[in-house]
C-alpha cells in the first residue's frame, strides 16, 4: 500500500450497510477511534440511521458513498454476496477498503480483490475482530506461556440456542448464508493465528432445525502433524458447552464463556468506556493431577482493529489483517464445505506464493 493518508488528517469513513453488523459493531467501533470520522452511511433506512447517528450523512445507495470525493475509507458491512462487487467498485474508485467477514463468497473473488488492491496501491483489510476477544486472548496467553505444554487437542465452540428459524438473509438459502459462513470465519481465523495452516480439513456441515433452509450446525477438524483442532458451531446448544477446551501434554485449560463485547455493544455500552471488554469468567488450568487453578482472563478490545487500521493508513504500522490471511480463512471455509459434500478429507487450496506470505 503506497497511498498513505497525511498524518494528523482525519480519515473520513463511509459505512455501507446498517443492519445488525453495521449498527452493532462497525459504527460504534469506528466512532470510538480518534482519527476516524464516520462521515457517511449507505442505508435504505435513513430514519434508523438518523436516530442513532444524527451527525452522519445518510445516502441511499452504496455507489453514492463510494464515489463521494471526501471519503478515504469504505467499510462494507452489507450482505455477504455484495462484498466482492462493492469492494471492487470501491477499490476501482481508489478508496481504502475494509470488508466484513467472510471476505467473499469464494477464493476466486478474494484473489481478484487482492490483485486489484495491489494494482491500485490501496489498503484492503478484512474485519476479523475476534482476534481481540477476551476468551481468545486468554487461551492464547496460556498456550504461549507454556502452561499446558505442547497442545495436542484444541477445541473451539461458538454455540447458540435459537431453535426458531428467523426471517433474515443469513438463514435463507441465498449465496453466502448459513451458520458456517457466519461463525466459521471467526473460529477459523483464531485457529490459523495460533497454529498456521493445517495439513488437511475434515468437515461435517448440516441443517438440523425444523424449517431451516441452510446449514445451522458445523463440526470441522483441522489436522496438524502433532495435534488436532476442532471447530464447532450450532444453533441448538442450550448450555453445557465450553467456549474453549485445550489439552496439552502437561495440563489442560478451559474457558467456559464467550467474550462479552458483543453483548456490551448490544446494551449500548460505548467501546472504551468503564468495564469495556472485561471478562469475569476466569480461565481454569487443570494440572497433571487434575487440580484446577484459576487465571484471570485479560480484557478484550475490538477497538484495536480500527485503531490499527487508522495507524496503517497513517503509515505507522502494517495492515492488521492482510488480505492473504483472510484468503487463508476462505480456503479453510471452502475445504470444509467440500469435505462435507463429498465425505472426503480435503487440503487447503493455496498457492506456494500465498503460503509463503503467511509464514
Residue spans of the language-model regions?
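N-terminal Rossmann-like dinucleotide-binding module
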Residues: 1-53
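C-terminal helix-rich "cap/oligomerization" subdomain common to oxidoreductases
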Residues: 1-10, 73-75, 308-359
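Active-site loop of classical SDR/Rossmann-like NAD(P)-dependent oxidoreductases
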Residues: 21, 293-307
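A short helix->loop->beta-strand "cap" motif at the edges of active sites that frequently abuts
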Residues: 56, 93-95, 120-122, 224-227
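Beta-loop-alpha module in the N-terminal Rossmann-like domain of NAD(P)-dependent dehydrogenases
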Residues: 56-115
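Rossmann-fold dehydrogenase core element
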Residues: 112-129, 150-154
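Predominantly a Rossmann-like dinucleotide-binding segment in NAD(P)-dependent oxidoreductases
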Residues: 130-211, 219, 343
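Contiguous beta-strand/loop segments that form the cofactor/metal-binding neighborhood of enzyme cores
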Residues: 189-271, 303-319, 336, 352-359
Amino acid at each position: 500500500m503506497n497511498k498513505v493518508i497525511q498524518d494528523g488528517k482525519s480519515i473520513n469513513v463511509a459505512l455501507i450497510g446498517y443492519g445488525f453488523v453495521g449498527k452493532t459493531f462497525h459504527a460504534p467501533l469506528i466512532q470510538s477511534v480518534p482519527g476516524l470520522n464516520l462521515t457517511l452511511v449507505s442505508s435504505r433506512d435513513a430514519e434508523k440511521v438518523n436516530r442513532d447517528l444524527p451527525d452522519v450523512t445518510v445516502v441511499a445507495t452504496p455507489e453514492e458513498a463510494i464515489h463521494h470525493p471526501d471519503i478515504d475509507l469504505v467499510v462494507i458491512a452489507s450482505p455477504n454476496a455484495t462484498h466482492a462487487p462493492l469492494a471492487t467498485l470501491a477499490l476501482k474508485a481508489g478508496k481504502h477498503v475494509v470488508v466484513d467477514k467472510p471476505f467473499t463468497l469464494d477464493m476466486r473473488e478474494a484473489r481478484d480483490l487482492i490483485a486489484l488492491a495491489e494494482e491500485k496501491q490501496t489498503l484492503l483489510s478484512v474485519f476479523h475482530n475476534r482476534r481481540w476477544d477476551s476468551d481468545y486472548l486468554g487461551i492464547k496467553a496460556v498456550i504461549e506461556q507454556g502452561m499446558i505444554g505442547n497442545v495436542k487437542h484444541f477445541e473451539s465452540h461458538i454455540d447458540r440456542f435459537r431453535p426458531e428459524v428467523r426471517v433474515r438473509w443469513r438463514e435463507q438459502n441465498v449465496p453466502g448464508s448459513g451458520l458456517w459462513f457466519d461463525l466459521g470465519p471467526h473460529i477459523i481465523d483464531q485457529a490459523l493465528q495460533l497454529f498456521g495452516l493445517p495439513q488437511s480439513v475434515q468437515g461435517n456441515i448440516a441443517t438440523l432445525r425444523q424449517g431451516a433452509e441452510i446449514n445451522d450446525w458445523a463440526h470441522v477438524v483441522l489436522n496438524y502433524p502433532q495435534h488436532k483442532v476442532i471447530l464447532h458451531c450450532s444453533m441448538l446448544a442450550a448450555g453445557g458447552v465450553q467456549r474453549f477446551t485445550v489439552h496439552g501434554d502437561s495440563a489442560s485449560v478451559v474457558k467456559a464463556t464467550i467474550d462479552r463485547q458483543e453483548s456490551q455493544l448490544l446494551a449500548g455500552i460505548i467501546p472504551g468506556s468503564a468495564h469495556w471488554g472485561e471478562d469475569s469468567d476466569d480461565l481454569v488450568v487443570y494440572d497433571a493431577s487434575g487440580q484446577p487453578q484459576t487465571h484471570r482472563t485479560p480484557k478484550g478490545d475490538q477497538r484495536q482493529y480500527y485503531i490499527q487500521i487508522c495507524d496503517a493508513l497513517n503509515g505507522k504500522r502494517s495492515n492488521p489483517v492482510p488480505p492473504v490471511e483472510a484468503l487463508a480463512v476462505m480456503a479453510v471455509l471452502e475445504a470444509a464445505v467440500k469435505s462435507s459434500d463429498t465425505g472426503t478429507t480435503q487440503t487447503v487450496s493455496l498457492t506456494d506464493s500465498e503460503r509463503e506470505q503467511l509464514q
